[in-house]
Design a protein with these regions (language model features):
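Active-site nucleotide-sugar/metal-binding loop of Leloir-type enzymes
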Residues: 110-125
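Short, acidic, metal-binding catalytic loop of nucleotide-sugar glycosyltransferases
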Residues: 50-63
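C-terminal catalytic/acceptor-binding lobe
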Residues: 227, 231-234, 238-317
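Short beta-strand-to-loop acidic/aromatic patch adjacent to the donor-nucleotide binding site
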Residues: 123-136
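N-proximal low-complexity "stem/linker" segments adjacent to membrane-targeting elements
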Residues: 2-53
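Aromatic-glycine-rich donor-binding/catalytic loop that engages nucleotide-sugar donors
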Residues: 192-204, 209-227, 236-242
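Acceptor/aglycone-binding surface of glycosyltransferases and processive sugar-polymer synthases
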Residues: 115, 137-210
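A conserved acidic beta->alpha catalytic loop
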Residues: 68-83
Length: 317
């Protein structure tokens, strides 16, 4: 009897040791969006993937990076030896490649963030990294040297969403589109939310952001728009009293010519209006008199959109 009791006591004294194991550290999941149009010069991508390689080597803090590549890009470059070598020797070496057929860039986000989310756990952070910026320049290298601070803000401050803001002057086409197009339309359809969003950022369509696990789960389970998804996430964060922050990225660009074409400007404004109209209907269609209110807002929105296109046509020349 004494032997049995002693054995039991010894077993019980060892059992709690399992409970002393260190809790899992929340990780950051990098999601790289490969350029839809492969640039002839690989210097920007080479610099970007030097950073990705460093992230991949820090597995205690970062999950294995994911790179989303549109299948149309692969087919367009299937006979390009430099592309094939860079894909195999660099992209696949330092990240898991997700090949996907995508309507637009935001669908690439959806695929990549969805894959990362399924690998993640509560408390993790998901970091979107656009691949089509001039990272090979002196300014771009400086940005890459501190871009990791963006997801760290979400991780340390327990924010739901952190938006990265590109530094631009008042004549920059992206700045002009957001001022005269995006925010003007936001104030038309969602005035209260627009005022709140502007407290946090001047770039409601930014491609740089990081998002917390629980907030991403909520967003993934709702309608995902093929464009202007950052704006949609900001609207959701404001509506749910989420915690939003911003990070100043720096003066980098994804415009090789330095400015947008008029056709691109018009397309971006049209897309913004289309998303806002759809989102407003989804939120208000159960209310009394919503159809009449929608027609009034639609007329106002049309006037705002036309004015924005006219202003930007003159400013972007």
């Amino acid at each position: 009897m004494n032997t049995t009791a002693g054995t039991t006591q010894k077993s019980q004294s060892k059992a709690p040791a399992k409970d002393l194991a260190a809790p899992r550290r929340n990780k950051i999941h990098p999601v790289v969006i490969y350029p839809y149009r492969q640039p002839g010069d690989f210097s920007d991508l080479e610099e970007l993937f030097r950073m990705v390689a460093a992230l991949d080597a820090s597995r205690d803090q970062y999950a294995r990076p994911i790179t989303v590549v549109d299948r149309k890009t692969c087919y367009a470059m299937e006979s390009s030896k430099p592309f094939i070598e860079f894909r195999k020797g660099t992209v696949a070496k330092y990240s898991d490649i997700l090949d996907a057929w995508c309507v637009d860039t935001c669908q690439m986000w959806y695929s990549g963030l969805g894959m990362a989310f399924e690998r993640g756990e509560p408390g993790d952070v998901y970091w979107l990294i656009p691949g089509d910026f001039n990272y090979g320049t002196a300014v771009g290298k400086d940005v890459l040297g501190r871009l990791h601070d963006l997801p760290q803000i979400v991780l340390e401050l327990r924010n739901d969403l952190c938006i990265g803001e590109i530094e631009t002057d008042h004549c920059n086409s992206k700045q002009l589109i957001d001022t005269y197009g995006t925010f003007a339309l936001l104030y038309t359809w969602f005035p209260d939310e627009a005022r709140e969003i502007r407290r946090y950022t001047e770039r409601p369509r930014s491609e740089f952001f990081a998002v917390r696990h629980a907030f991403l789960q909520a967003v993934l389970c709702e309608r995902w728009y093929p464009y202007e998804q950052t704006m949609v996430m900001l609207l959701r964060a404001v509506a749910s009293n989420g915690q939003i922050s911003r990070f100043f990225v720096g003066n980098i660009s994804d415009l090789p010519q330095g400015k947008e074409s008029l056709a691109s400007v018009m397309q971006q404004i049209d897309r913004t209006e289309r998303v806002l109209k759809t989102l407003w209907r989804e939120r208000n269609q159960g209310r009394d008199g919503w159809a009449e209110r929608y027609r009034v807002l639609e007329q106002q929105s049309e006037e705002v959109r036309r004015a924005a296109v006219l202003i930007l046509q003159n400013l972007c020349q």
